[in-house]
Each structure stands twice: as C-alpha cells, then as structure tokens.
Amino acid sequence: MSSKCFDSPLFLNQKEELSEFFKKTKKKYHQTSFYIDQRKKRAVLIDDNNQPIGGKWTFDTENRKKYPSKKIPPSVTFPEKDEGYDTAYEYTSKHFESHYGELIDHPLYPTCHKTARHWLDQFLKNRFYEFGPYEDAIHKDYSILNHSVLTPMLNVGLLTPNQVLDTSINYGLNNNIPINSLEGFVRQIMGWREFIRGMYEAKGTQERTL
C-alpha cells in the first residue's frame, strides 16, 4: 500500500520550510526573529528598501492598553441558527440536562465557509481599527471587545491563514487602519500562530515531557 502526503492549507509554512529556523540543535527560539524572517520572506508590510512599513517590525509595546472602564466595545452579530444548531441544542438539552454552562439560542461561531467569511468581514469593518491597542485586553462584562475570534475557523479550516492575511492586509491598507492594528493582527497570524506550530514540530515531545 502506498501513501502520499499533501501540503496543508491550514498553515503558511510547510514542515520543510520550518526546519531551517527550528533547527533541533538550537537551544532557544525567538518569536520576534522568526516573525521578521517571515515578513521579509513573504514581503509583507515592507517598503522598497526591505524595511518595515511604519518604521518598526513590531508595535507590540504600544498594543497593551487596558480597556477603558466606560468604553463600549463594538457590537457583534453572531451567526444565525440553522437546522444543525437546533439538532445539537435539542440533543444537548435532552442528554446533558445537568451540564455546566448555559445554552444560548444562537451559535457562537460560524460553521461553514460562507458564515466564516462574513465573520472575518465583520471584524475588519467593526473591530479592526482599534484591534492593536486592545489586542491583549480583557473585560469582566464583555467577551470579544476588539478581538477577531478567528482561531476556531482557522483551526478547523473554514478559513485559511493565507485568505485571512490577504483580506486583512488589503483592507487595512485601503481603509486607513492604524499600522499598530494592522501589524499587530498580521503578527498574530504570521508570527505567533506559525511560531507555535514550529515549536510543536521541533520541540513538541520535549515540551510535553519536561
């Protein structure tokens, strides 16, 4: 029996592309160095002199603001329920009546590509502008704030990182999105998500058995 491995669209880098940076002989890996390499390699948010747009590779130090106590975050439109959600709702109510948590009358996340794309577009139009300064913020009364909440869709393949990056960069450059918000979002996808995947491939077993 023969087998064939295909490249995964769920990540920007394939395993062999990661191997150059994540050499097993290295003792430490630095996310910022990896991220800068990725920006240069893919010519993302850099000028003709191969320098970062905005003058810095990362605006992370400017993106740690506390969410103002009286600020009202942008409203979020959740996906409409469908037959699949109704079936899951009824099944959970019947078989897990004493479960922790609370069922709500609508899905929290998209469950198909079309609704996932709408979710991405909603983030870009309503929450992207102030994503940067509040990307690390939390609030006791609100769940989403200016976050994209795209991880579930990326992890199950409803959206690909290439699609998310291409769409968000194009939107950001054409709609006056502040550079700290645009760069901060790119860093989450191209920097942290890809870096952690590389760490898993290079040192996953070691990290799990420390």
Task: List where the protein language model places each region.
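Beta-rich, aromatic/charged-enriched effector core domains that present basic-aromatic interfaces
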Residues: 1-109
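Catalytic cores of enzymes that engage adenine nucleotides and/or redox cofactors via long glycine-rich
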Residues: 61-210
